[in-house]
């Protein structure tokens, strides 16, 4: 029998202390989230991997979305899943998931993503060229955001002029906005993507990634318009949010650990491998996306009944002391392979190779040009985004040098 725990209102500002407490009590706890949603929160590494792959668990929001209302203390504040966006592979189980992922995976193999490196380097260099020693800037605004949004917009064939709209829509969709704000943002993005998908479908096929996806034909099977819109939404939001927050969180971690920053300045060849440690320590995603139990599930001796929302804390699993020694310490020389920052199993992040490449390029060029950058605000004044899903800062003020 578990005790229902109410998570504090400032949970997203300091989740690690909460996770440490919960993890010490057991692998999974029944909790009320700050906005009143009752979930079973998984905080241990081994049980997180089980929960992410268990056949007793489903990701189908069409069939399980009603649980968000059933388990909320304030059903009126529960955001509705935008129907246009629900049909992406993140919200489906096999065989529907298998079909959609097969069409997308081909474009995101490590080999194909590596072909993007020269263009990513070019975009990063252009952004850095616009910055100067002595500047005080929000690093997210001038660098961490424009780099990945430019890359993903080019892959999807979307004019870069729309990037500020996407940032605003994404913020509304991923943060604790009101249902009305979320619905308005979802409607605006859906309308834009419908127009974009229709235009590409009516145009002659070309060699761009999204055109290939629109016109892809697997043994007579093609994505329909709604599937393409939902897929574009997933790629657009996940394709930039992950890298924005990975860069921002990593820079903050380095500025708070100058000895580790010095190691990377002295040995920049360690940056690619250190990516895994940054993902482990302060990954860009707090919890895995929506899951619920179709059947009762045993997690480390705790039974989660059927019909419950299962929330897997990726950041908690990655700081489990049973899996990683000194888990709260940044160690850029650590072998952090096996972390679950990108998920685990069939829903492992398809864009992981692209996020890793963008991070490698961004950190290499940033530290080469501004090796002595410093934080331009007291760490305790920094505010994390008001989102259970995303782990990222509102702003990251730095002084370039």
Please tell me what each predicted stretch does.
Residues 1-401:
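Cytochrome P450
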């Amino acid at each position: 029998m578990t005790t229902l725990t109410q998570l504090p209102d400032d949970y997203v500002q300091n989740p690690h202390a909460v996770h440490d407490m919960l993890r010490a009590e057991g692998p999974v706890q029944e909790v009320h989230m700050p906005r009143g949603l009752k979930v079973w929160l998984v905080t241990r590494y081994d049980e997180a991997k089980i929960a992410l792959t268990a056949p007793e668990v489903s990701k189908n929001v069409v069939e399980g979305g009603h649980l968000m209302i059933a388990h909320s203390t304030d059903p009126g504040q529960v955001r509705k899943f935008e129907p246009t966006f629900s049909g992406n592979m993140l919200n489906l189980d096999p065989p529907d998931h298998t079909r959609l992922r097969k069409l997308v995976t081909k474009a995101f193999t490590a080999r194909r993503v590596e072909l993007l490196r020269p263009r990513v380097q070019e975009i990063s260099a252009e952004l850095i060229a616009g910055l100067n020693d002595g500047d005080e800037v929000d690093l997210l605004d001038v660098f961490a955001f424009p780099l990945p949004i430019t890359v993903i917009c080019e892959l999807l064939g979307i004019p870069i002029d729309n990037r500020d709209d996407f940032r605003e829509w994404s913020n509304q969709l991923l943060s604790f906005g009101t249902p009305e704000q979320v619905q308005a943002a979802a409607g605006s993005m859906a309308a834009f993507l419908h127009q974009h998908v229709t235009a590409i479908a009516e145009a002659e096929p070309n060699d761009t990634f999204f055109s290939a996806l629109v016109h892809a034909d697997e043994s007579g099977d093609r994505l329909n318009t709604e599937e393409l819109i939902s897929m574009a939404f997933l790629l657009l939001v996940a394709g930039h949010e992950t890298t924005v927050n990975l860069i921002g969180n990593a820079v903050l971690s380095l500025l708070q650990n100058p000895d580790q920053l010095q190691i990377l300045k002295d040995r920049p060849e360690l940056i690619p491998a250190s990516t895994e440690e940054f993902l482990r320590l302060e990954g860009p995603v707090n919890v895995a996306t929506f899951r619920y139990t179709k059947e009762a599930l045993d997690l480390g001796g705790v039974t989660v009944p059927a019909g419950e929302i299962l929330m897997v804390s990726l950041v908690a699993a990655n700081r489990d002391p049973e899996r990683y020694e000194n888990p709260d310490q940044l160690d850029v020389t650590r072998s952090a392979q096996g972390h679950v920052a990108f998920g685990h199993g069939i829903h492992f992040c398809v864009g992981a190779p692209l996020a890793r490449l963008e991070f490698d390029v961004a950190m290499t060029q940033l530290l080469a040009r501004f090796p002595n950058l410093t934080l331009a605000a007291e760490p305790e004044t920094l505010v994390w985004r008001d989102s259970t899903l995303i782990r990222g800062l509102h702003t990251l003020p730095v002084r370039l040098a």
